[in-house]
């Protein structure tokens, strides 16, 4: 199960599509993509 926006993460693979893991704050943030 993937993590949603602002969900805790250890790597981008933890996050849902279009989200990437912010290594400095350890949460999933939008990666700027739409497709």
UniProtKB/Swiss-Prot annotation:
Q: Does the keyword Ubl conjugation apply?
A: no
This protein's superkingdom? Eukaryota
Keyword hit for Secreted: yes
Q: What are the UniProt keywords, alphabetically?
A: Disulfide bond, Ion channel impairing toxin, Knottin, Neurotoxin, Pharmaceutical, Potassium channel impairing toxin, Secreted, Toxin, Voltage-gated potassium channel impairing toxin, Voltage-gated sodium channel impairing toxin
Q: Where in the cell is it found?
A: Secreted
S-S pairs: 2-16, 9-21, 15-28
Q: Name one GO molecular function term.
A: potassium channel regulator activity
Q: What is its main location?
A: secreted
Q: Which Pfam families match?
A: Toxin_12
Per the entry, what this protein does is: Gating-modifier toxin that potently inhibits inactivation of the mammalian Nav1.1/SCN1A sodium channel (EC(50)=38 nM). Also moderately inhibits inactivation of Nav1.2/SCN2A (EC(50)=236 nM) and Nav1.3/SCN3A (EC(50)=220 nM) when the channels are expressed in oocytes without the beta-1 auxiliary subunit. Does not inhibit inactivation of Nav1.2/SCN2A when the channel is coexpressed with the beta-1 auxiliary subunit. When tested on Nav1.1/SCN1A channel, it enhances peak current amplitude and potently delays channel inactivation in a dose-dependent manner, leading to a large sustained current.
Q: What else is known?
A: Shows poor stability in cerebrospinal fluid and moderate stability in human serum. Half-life of the toxin is about 1.7 hour in cerebrospinal fluid. Half-life of the native toxin is about 10 hours in human serum. Negative results: does not inhibit Nav1.4/SCN4A, Nav1.5/SCN5A, Nav1.6/SCN8A, Nav1.7/SCN9A, and Nav1.8/SCN10A at concentrations up to 50 nM or 1 uM. Does not inhibit Nav1.2/SCN2A at concentrations up to 50 nM. Has no or very weak effect on Kv1.1/KCNA1, Kv1.2/KCNA2, Kv1.3/KCNA3, Kv1.4/KCNA4, Kv1.5/KCNA5, Kv1.6/KCNA6 and Kv3.4/KCNC4. Does not show significant effects on Kv1.7/KCNQ1, Kv10.1/KCNH1/EAG1, Kv11.1/KCNH2/ERG1, KCa1.1/KCNMA1, KCa2.1/KCNN1 and KCa2.3/KCNN3.
Give the domain note: The presence of a 'disulfide through disulfide knot' structurally defines this protein as a knottin.
The family annotation for this protein states: Belongs to the neurotoxin 10 (Hwtx-1) family. 09 (HaTx) subfamily.
Q: What is this protein called?
A: Delta-theraphotoxin-Hm1a
Question: What taxonomic ancestry is recorded?
Answer: Eukaryota, Metazoa, Ecdysozoa, Arthropoda, Chelicerata
């Amino acid at each position: 199960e993937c993590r949603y926006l602002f969900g805790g993460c250890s790597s981008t693979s933890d996050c849902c599509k279009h989200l990437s893991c912010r290594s400095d704050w350890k949460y999933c943030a939008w990666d700027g993509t739409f497709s």
